[in-house]
Amino acid sequence: MSTYPKTAALMKRGTDFLGCETAILCGAMSWVSERNLVAAISNAGGFGVIACGAMTPELLDTEIAATKALTTKPFGVNLITMHPALFDLIAVCRKHGVTHVVLAGGIPPKGSVEAIKADESGIKVICFAPTLALAKKLLRSGADALVIEGMEAGGHIGPVSTSVLAQEILPELAGEHLIFVAGGIGRGEAIASYLEMGAAGVQLGTRFACATESIAHPDFKKAFFRASAREAVASVQVDPRLPVIPVRALKNTGTEEFTAKQREVAALLDAGEVDMGEAQLQIEHFWAGALRRAVIEGDVENGSVMAGQSVGMVTKEEPAADIIAELMSQCEAALAR
């Protein structure tokens, strides 16, 4: 018998789909969601997800193998749809028998979902849906489950809040489809409310970034512990021509450097030195480098400290298993009221 019977009952569709004990996914955070944190979350009954980010197929191959050495539980891999080697990365996931692939960063390119599912691989595909119309389209295109992520989340974000997305999408789709809610979730009471609305589970990133098993630099973690919700701000788009997806991170010098980088890329566009695709790639490379500086090197002033608005609820370093247990007990208490 479950310690959290009410929560377990509402999460059952999600846990059956994921193959784990609690329908709590860890959001894929570049440089943070690697073998150690992913394995710790899966071993604790949650669902860890490797952030492939800008990894080459060779690096992803190594990371999946290293994760499998640390856990026998299921875990997923998050792939960025605009990655130039997307189909090679899919082949790596298939080779390793990864059970779930999460496609993030836009509409999956033609043939990508088919490539994941070819030869009856049994791999489940999870996609991000920022609107109801796109959610329906993704489900028609072969997505097995969706994550709806509000603007409170850290990293790349859309323009609509989690609570509004949940109200728009869950009543329409959650009866027949698996929908996971993400963005700004820091406590179990919030999980309870989304489960009661029909969500199959939830996804949290910020809450796990400072887990004991997270390899993030101690100074990166300290920045989280000091921060309040209002310090996790979204980046500003300088030039309307640049298709810059806003990024939520803690306000610092790096935030201003990103504004300057946009101006520099816009000037290159004006001069005809780069096309729109190259401009977007330069912006993404900026983020990848800035994030590494913060997470790995601990440069929290010039690097990008990507964090969701739930950062104010992250006050100490604790094991992933303790974080999951606390979320589950808070959720159960809320459902029992």
Model-predicted regions and their roles:
Residues P159-L178, G186-R337:
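Conserved active-site-proximal phosphate/metal-binding subdomains
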Residues M151-E152, G183-I185:
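Acidic, glycine-rich active-site loops and adjacent beta-strand->loop/helix elements
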Residues V32, I185-G186:
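Residue-level detector of alpha-helix initiation sites
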